[in-house]
Amino acid sequence: MLIVAKDVSDLRVFTLAEVYDLYTLDEGQDFYGFLSQDFFPDGICCVWEESGRYVAALRLQRWRDGYLLEGLQTHREHRGKGYATRLVSAALEALKMEKVYSHISRENSPSIALHTACGFHKILDYATYLDGSVHPDSDTYVYENPRC
């Protein structure tokens, strides 16, 4: 199930029992902490929830003439099950954004395959992050909604 949050307060609050079993993405980082960090003004957080648990999430931020998809993560226990693909596809469909960009490391072949399957294509052989820094080891991809 897709959950769209325009503010960190829109995210479901964990119960006390869940606090002891928070998802970890990488050592020491809880999933809720990941979702709520860097919530920029006009940012959007999309979460895929399965059986009452967050299993994948992404953030979208206004960028250039569209949005920048960043922070796409799937909990390690749920990787390889198609949740991230479902999340990206559902978010693109639900939000009806004209253009969505994504920066992907050239070494991240699973993410490149996911983005390509969701209709993204490569437009630049570098990435310019929100802070203006340029990363030559990542490429920029774009999704252009054919219905807009």
Language model regions located:
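Conserved GNAT acetyl-CoA-binding A-motif
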Residues: 95-106
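C-terminal "cap" of GNAT-fold acetyltransferases
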Residues: 128-148
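Conserved acetyl-CoA-binding loop-helix of GNAT-fold acetyltransferases
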Residues: 74, 80-94, 113, 117
